[in-house]
Amino acid sequence: MTVAKSLEGANLVWQRVNKALWSMSGSPVEKAAFLRTLKNWLATQKGNPRLQYLSFSDVTTDAVTVPEVSASGCTIYAIFAKKQNTATDAYLKINDSATLAGGANGANVKITIPLLVGNDEVAMIFQPGLIMATGVVVASETTAAGGTDTTTGDGPNGFMIIG
């Protein structure tokens, strides 16, 4: 599913972030990191830029479910991912591409986030932002080196904040 980059006022994004963290039972540490630290830094150091909230759920590398969150370049300010309550390892991969996931060779992979325990969660904040030149495709595989898709039910849920 392709989602065009559509930036909006920061307050709307922060409302969505707050709702998502509560609905996914994010830990208090992640809530504080996003809702205080990142929000304050963007407001004071980046001039409160227009942002976009992008959610993903049950990520696999199936072409139907890989969310292409931006078909043009963008800057990622934050990622939150929470693994479903399964024993199967999931490696969330953030790819710098408008159309392709990393695959076995990982040519497009910029970030690999291991989610190895049921309900594992990770919050990552990028200051001054992680620049993605061509777009972002989110994928999940069973190993860090890649190639084997995460199956439905094992993939992580979460969101990104981009600008």
Per-region residue spans from a language model:
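Surface-exposed coil/turn segments at beta-strand junctions on protein surfaces, enriched
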Residues: 71-72, 117, 131-133
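Short beta-strand/loop motifs in extracellular/secreted proteins, especially
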Residues: 77, 88-92, 156
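Extracellular "spike/adhesin" assembly and maturation modules
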Residues: 1-32
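Short, surface-exposed beta-strand/strand-loop-strand elements in extracellular ectodomains
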Residues: 85-107
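Short proline/glycine- and polar residue-rich coil/turn motifs
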Residues: 113-120
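Noncatalytic modules at the cell exterior or secretory-pathway interfaces
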Residues: 77-79, 129-147
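Exposed aromatic-hydrophobic patches
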Residues: 120-129
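C-terminal interaction-tip segments
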Residues: 2-14, 42-72, 84, 141-163
